[in-house]
Curated annotation (Swiss-Prot):
The modification Phosphoserine is found at residues 3, 35, 49, 102, 124, 131, 138. The keyword Lipid metabolism does not apply. PANTHER family: HEMOGLOBIN FAMILY MEMBER, HEMOGLOBIN SUBUNIT ALPHA. GO terms for biological process: hydrogen peroxide catabolic process. Coiled coil: none annotated. SUPFAM superfamilies: Globin-like. Heterotetramer of two alpha chains and two beta chains. This is Hemoglobin subunit alpha. Heme b binds at residue 87. The modification Phosphothreonine is found at residues 8, 108, 134, 137. Keywords: Acetylation, Heme, Iron, Metal-binding, Oxygen transport, Phosphoprotein, Transport. O2 binds at residue 58. Belongs to the globin family.
Length: 141
């Protein structure tokens, strides 16, 4: 459960990300594909090379979804309902992959914003991404 301080940290972090969201999303995806090669199986039609337009485009989708979630942190199920349906029923993504991408997002954010990535912010973002993952996998049952 996100505390009021967590929600403040999440919103402040997403404001600092600003126009870099798409680039950070793509970088996190690249990290995930390199660190956890089995995740590539969900993207057989993608050019997974560094800087590919498809990875950049999907990175933007990830970043936009997370920005929307951060803006609606008090109603994550409502904000992510369509994505939850898509990932559970059409794409059938293994839920563990959300944890892997979350980890790669945290690493990416820490690399780009080391001064702002305090232990408290890290914990808040980790809880936020875990909450997003929980919502995205809630319709698997």
């Amino acid at each position: 459960v996100l505390s009021p301080a967590d929600k403040t940290n999440v919103k402040a972090s997403w404001e600092k990300i600003g126009g870099h969201g798409a680039a950070y999303g793509a970088e996190a995806l690249e990290r995930m594909f390199l660190s956890f090669p089995t995740t590539k199986t969900y993207f057989p039609h993608f050019d997974l090379s560094h800087g590919s337009a498809q990875v950049q485009g999907h990175g933007k989708k990830v970043a936009d979804a997370l920005a929307n979630a951060a803006a609606h942190v008090d109603d994550l199920p409502g904000a992510l309902s369509a994505l939850s349906d898509l990932h559970a029923h059409k794409l059938r993504v293994d839920p563990v992959n959300f944890k892997l991408l979350s980890h790669c997002l945290l690493v990416t954010l820490a690399a780009h914003h080391p001064a702002e990535f305090t232990p408290a912010v890290h914990a808040s973002l980790d809880k936020f991404l875990a909450s997003v993952s929980t919502v995205l996998t809630s319709k698997y049952r």
